[in-house]
Amino acid sequence: MNFHLHINRGAGAFVCGEGSALTASIEGNRGMPRVKPPRTVEQGLWGKPTVLNNVETYANVPKIILQGADWFHTIGTEGSPGTKTFSLTGSIENTGLIEVPMGTSLRHIIYDIGGGLKSGAAFKGVQIGGPSGGCLIDDQIDHPPVSYT
């Protein structure tokens, strides 16, 4: 399979992670979200239907093409197949980028993979989802598990 790929570097504004803001930025306009509908799959880049996904989604495509959708659905949970990447940072023993099956609890990620908190410090909370995410306290890191729902 051959295809042409063009990578266009954006201005780096957080808001440009939103699909319509990203297309506006690529078109040379201010990267601001637009009112929907239409969605970018109907009218996106230069007014044409546009598929936009994050790098995590695109990273799964070759594995699914090579091994099939049935294989992909064996990873994770029935309602949330596949994997999720996390960047472990802060006061944790083992920092770095990890990939876990959907359905993995944050407690498992923090303590079993991340090695727990440095110096045995008491857990106060964890921020998930980047700047637009939220914070969870100890009694919230088992449920809900990592999922799409």
Give the residues covered by each predicted segment.
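Hydrophobic alpha-helical positions that pack around
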Residues: 1-102, 114
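Acidic-enriched, low-complexity/disordered segments with a strong bias for Aspartate over Glutamate
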Residues: 70, 112, 138-142
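Short amphipathic, charge-patterned alpha-helical segments
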Residues: 103-118
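Terminal amphipathic helices with adjacent charged low-complexity linkers/tails
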Residues: 118-126, 130-146
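Conserved small/polar residues in nucleotide/adenosyl-binding loops
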Residues: 149
